[in-house]
Design a protein with these regions (language model features):
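N-terminal secretory signal peptides
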Residues: 2-34
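Intrinsic disorder/low-complexity segments enriched in polar/small residues
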Residues: 11-12, 28, 59, 63-64, ...
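Short intrinsically disordered, low-complexity segments
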Residues: 10, 21, 280, 500-501
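Small/flexible residues
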Residues: 9, 15, 37, 410, ...
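Ligand-binding pockets and gating/stacking loops
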Residues: 23-494
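Extended rod-forming repeat segments used as scaffolds/tethers
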Residues: 15-17, 386, 505-506, 511
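Single conserved hydrophobic/aromatic residue that forms the stacking wall/gate
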Residues: 492-511
């Protein structure tokens, strides 16, 4: 956020100069830090090393080295395949059975009872009181796309056109069956609210790619179905310093409130006031060593720079008409298509983690028309983003992720499907991912993931590996525990998480 001042600048400068003088005199009277300040400094630990990532490049004496990082992980554990992530979050839980996971057996069983051997003792959300669970066959036909012949729903023809660039993961699983906790688990790797989001972890580990824009940006859109709310804690930094939390850009109007100066305030005067305030903050921080003061300093500086960088970012007047046609976007309409175009522009300018939420996939009823309607909002733009990045030579170091917080049941819920956590689908492209292939499988009904099962922790470990980070070496100490995105170090993660999905599983690799 940007703080604007409308008072007399000469008066403000005089008062601030006096405050700085007083604090300097106070500082000189302190011969040593007291015990509390010392302990505060110790408790910051490794985290404090990353706090200066917004104030300028750190340790970039070998900028040509692929292992150099501006964040807490420096040097990186591996040579990175990806430099940035664009996460296209299909909020609401898209049905894998109408999009990415073809199940002819389920079509044959349409209207017949689901075998109890599959569902007994399983979490089935709102269907648990039904006396008889009946199969609901796929409501859309599938077709082979590309040279790879990947089977993708006809509801997603444009995503089908990039079949040779994407890897479809058909064996995702999660642990939470309701929307908000499922988003929390997918974003943080924990069922407990208040943990850092994966975007915050990535920004903490790698640092910012630009000094003029936030390192973690969130955009949202809706259309096609029931709009489930998305809580802002999904992009929160948790116990990491708050400078690593995501910045939510508004899809219409000014993306950030107060980005423009009010009448009577100019950039030069505002810059002088911010510099004076930050000088006071820096003096204070020498005494208390508080990471949140560093955050405040960086936020003031970032807000000031964003007054120039953000208007340039959202000014799409120089984008050619064929680019709007490619995405199906209209300037300023706040659509998923416009957000995808903005995501590419953010990626070009160095934003590390870009997260786009599209709400509208919660099809408890009318799944056939619902999927088709929602798909029309996202299909063209999702494919356009991959094509655009590829044409610009950016796809090779940009990881694009597409998927929701869970899938949908193969059993009918009226004319729709209920929430499902035992097996669903994602796709990934770029950033070192092998395209034109699928990974894992569910059973014949699309109920249980049975081949190369992927947990959320496996998923996170793979993302980190592509970024050059070994997940079990990437920790942050909080309340005496070494936390990581893939869980507290003492907790179990599956064997696949040790190396991410790149480990040999069934003789196949996706990275």
């Amino acid at each position: 956020m940007v703080i604007c001042f409308t008072c007399d600048y000469e008066l403000v400068r005089n008062h601030l100069a006096l405050l700085i003088l007083i604090m300097n005199l106070y500082q000189q009277s302190i011969n040593q830090l007291n015990r509390r300040s010392f302990l505060n400094g110790v408790s910051v630990g490794v985290g404090s090393l990353a706090l200066t990532s917004l104030l300028g490049p750190q340790g970039l004496t070998k900028e040509d080295s692929p292992l150099v990082s501006r964040g807490a992980v420096n040097p990186l554990h591996f040579a990175p395949r990806a430099k940035r992530i664009i996460h296209l979050c299909m909020a609401g839980g898209p049905s894998h059975l109408e999009t990415l996971d073809y199940k002819p057996k389920l079509a044959e069983m349409n209207g017949k009872p689901m075998p109890k051997s599959i569902t007994d003792g399983q979490p089935i959300a709102q269907l648990q009181n039904n006396k008889q669970l009946k199969c609901l066959g796929p409501q859309h036909e599938f077709e082979k796309y590309g040279k790879s012949g990947q089977l993708i729903s006809k509801a997603l023809p444009q995503i089908g056109s990039i079949a040779d660039d994407i890897c479809i993961i058909k064996s995702m699983t999660t642990q939470q069956i309701n929307h908000d906790p499922a988003h929390t688990f997918m974003n943080t790797g924990s069922q407990i609210s208040g943990r850092p989001s994966m975007g915050s972890w990535v920004l903490y580990g790698l640092g910012k790619g630009s000094d003029n824009l936030p390192g973690y940006v969130v955009l949202s859109s809706s259309g096609g179905g029931q709009d489930q709310p998305i809580a802002s804690r999904q992009w929160h930094s948790g116990f990491l310093p708050s400078r690593y939390q995501g910045v939510h850009f508004h899809s219409t109007g000014d993306p950030v409130l107060y980005i423009s100066n009010p009448n009577g305030v100019n950039q030069k005067g505002q810059g002088e006031v911010i510099s004076a305030i930050n000088a006071i903050n820096k003096i204070r921080n020498k005494t208390v060593v508080d990471p949140e003061i560093d955050t405040r300093i960086s936020q003031y500086e970032m807000a000031f720079r964003m007054q120039t960088s953000v208007p340039e970012l959202i000014d799409t007047s120089k984008e050619p008409k064929h680019m709007f046609d490619l995405y199906g976007a209209k300037p300023g309409d706040g659509s998923f298509a416009s957000n995808c175009l903005l995501a590419r522009r953010l990626a070009e300018r160095g934003t590390r983690f870009i997260q786009l939420y599209h709400r509208g996939w919660d099809h408890h009823g009318g799944v056939k028309n619902g999927v088709l309607t929602t798909a029309k909002h996202v299909d063209k733009a999702s494919a356009a983003l991959v094509k655009d990045l590829k044409d610009r030579g950016m796809l090779e170091d940009t990881l694009v992720i597409w998927g929701g917080e869970f899938g949908r049941t193969p059993m009918a819920q009226g004319s729709g499907r209920d929430h499902h956590i035992k097996g669903f689908s994602f796709w990934m492209a770029g950033g070192g991912i092998k395209g034109g292939m699928s990974y894992g499988n569910t059973d014949d009904f699309g109920y249980n993931a049975v081949e190369d099962v992927v947990t959320v922790h496996d998923f996170h470990a793979t993302i980190l590996k592509l970024l050059g980070i070994q997940h079990d070496k990437f920790t942050y100490k909080f309340q005496g525990l070494d936390f990581r995105l893939t869980g507290v170090c003492l907790l179990y993660t599956s064997d696949a998480a040790d190396e991410g999905l790149g480990v040999d599983l069934g003789g196949r690799r996706i990275i």
